[in-house]
Structure formats: C-alpha cells, structure tokens
Amino acid sequence: MPPRKKRRQAAQKPQLLFHQQPLEAPKHRCRFPQLPVVTHTRQVPSKPVDHNTITSWVSPQFDTTAESWFPGKRKHHHRDHARRSSRKSTSSRFPCLTFETPQSSASSATPGILASRDGPSQPEKDISGRPLVPMLSPQSCRELSAHTFPDFPCVFIPPDIQTPESPGQGEPIPSELRENSLPSCSLHTSTPKSPEPGPVLVTDTPEEKYGIKVTWRRRRHLFAYLRERGKLSRSQFLVKD
C-alpha cells in the first residue's frame, strides 16, 4: 500500500477576544453545576489480596492470561502472515536443480577434479549460477596426460616431406594458360550477377520537357498548337524557379 500523505499541521488560530467577562454559571444547558466537595469520609479497614489464590476457582477456559498470546492488532498481523505464507509457497514451489554427470565422464575423472569436488562445499544457488570449470594444477595436468595415453610409448611425428617444385615455376605464365589451368580461381574472382530490375514505377522525364509544367506535358498536342499560334507566353508553361 502507498504510504499515507503527511497532513500539514493547521496553523494555530489566535484566541478570540471578548469585550465582556464570562459569567460564573454553567456554560451549557446540558452541563450541571459542580457538586460540593465531600468533607466527611469514612475509613474502612482493608484486607491484603493474594493474587495467586484469587483466580484458583476460575475455569481454565476463562483464563485471562491466554489473551496475552494474541497480539493487539489481529487484522494487520493476519494480513502480514498471509503475505509471508504466500511468498514462502511461491518460493518453495520450484525445487532446486540438481546436475547429474554421465558415467563415462565420471569414470575418466582425474585426481585434480576429484580434489576440487571434495573441497569446501558451496550453496547450490552459487553453483547453479556459475559454469562448472575444473581447477587443474600443473601436477594434475601431467597425471592427466599419463592417464589418457598409457598404451602409446612414443608420439608419432610425420616425416619432413618437401613438395617438388614445378619446372616452370620461375617463368611467367601467360594469361590464357592461367585462365585455362585455374578454372576454380576464375569462378571465385568473377563478379556476382546484379539482381534483375523491378517494375518501373515512374518513367524519367525527357530532357526536352525539363522546366515545363505537368499540365502542358500531359497535353502536348494542345501545347504545340497554342505555341505555334503564339497564344502561350513563357511564364504560362514554364515552372517558376
């Protein structure tokens, strides 16, 4: 709920000033005059009360001490309890994810990985949010290399083979032979075909019709007839700059 707006304290109004003094009488008709002060009193002997035995005859269901278990504002606490219970139910609705490793990866686990797993356990929330990266030391890497390749005594190294040079490598190759000998390269160097042009939306204006108004361009026969007769001035058919 939004917080309540703070009410501004009203400015204290000045006290009213009366020209006449108030009368010594009841100020309102509903009020009664003050009773005279009691002067003659009686003294009654008092008896001490034992609070432990005074409620011994009361039934337990009417015990007043049970009210202390309930808070003063029950409605507000009930709402807060309902909100907390709803939050708890929504948070515990989805269980935490658990990761299972396959048997093949578990069988080929190295001592370094096992040592990192046996370390101080962290909460599941942190583990699920981070990627699982094994921490390997240099010693564990050596053990891993010895463990993964136990049957091979030596590493196979390919022989140093040099490709023979072509006899005409130093001589220049003519352009015709180069195109015939390398057809695959010519395919890569060829320019891509341009896409086909789409439909023409608006045709270009001919150069002789530049500066002429559109109305006379559409009526070229009438325009030519009126120009021959001299009934059209330049300001009537030319576009103003």
Curated annotation (Swiss-Prot):
Domain topic, free-text comment: The RAD1-binding motif mediates interaction with RAD1.
Main location: nucleus
UniProt keyword list: Cell cycle, Chromosome, DNA damage, DNA repair, Nucleus, Phosphoprotein, Ubl conjugation
UniProt organism field: Bos taurus (Bovine)
Biased composition (Basic residues): 1-10, 72-87
InterPro entries (alphabetical): RHNO1
Location of the motif D-box: 129-136
Gene behind the chain: RHNO1
Ranges spanned by the short sequence motif KEN box, renumbered to the chain: 177-181
Any GO BP annotation: double-strand break repair via alternative nonhomologous end joining
Biased composition regions of type Polar residues, renumbered to the chain: 100-110, 181-193
Transmembrane annotation, as ranges: none
Function noted in UniProt: Involved in microhomology-mediated end-joining (MMEJ) DNA repair by promoting recruitment of polymerase theta (POLQ) to DNA damage sites during mitosis. MMEJ is an alternative non-homologous end-joining (NHEJ) machinery that takes place during mitosis to repair double-strand breaks in DNA that originate in S-phase. Accumulates in M-phase; following phosphorylation by PLK1, interacts with POLQ, enabling its recruitment to double-strand breaks for subsequent repair.
Residues spanned by motif RAD1-binding motif: 56-62
Stretch list, region Disordered: 1-27, 68-134, 157-204
A cellular-component GO term for this protein: site of double-strand break
MF terms (GO), sorted A to Z: chromatin-protein adaptor activity
Protein name: RAD9, HUS1, RAD1-interacting nuclear orphan protein 1
